[in-house]
Amino acid sequence: MANRINVLFVCSKNQWRSPTAEAVYRDDPRVSVRSRGTAKSARQTIHAADLAWADLVLVMEDKHRHRLLADFPGDTKYLPIQVLHIPDDYQFMDPELVELIRFSAEPFIEAAATKA
């Protein structure tokens, strides 16, 4: 098996979506995962060290990608940041959210894992 890739999931407050994504992929042998939020009030706020750790960043909405590019221009210059287009309409581990995360994230994770 190739090396594991480091996947960082990002939403606003690191409360429902990105922690759910982290839980969904926690035991996947292809990846190591973290989740962070872009808001100053996030449970775990994103820092430059998180971006340095990541091989792939999966954000829930366009606004998260824009925030990362604005706040961390040097750290994101060559980092793949993909938007999953998952709205903030779900609670932690909501079955529909889990399904959306798997459906949206899997192509990016599979592509990155294949390259690793």
Specify the residue positions occupied by each region the protein language model found:
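Short polar/charged helix/loop
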Residues: 1-116
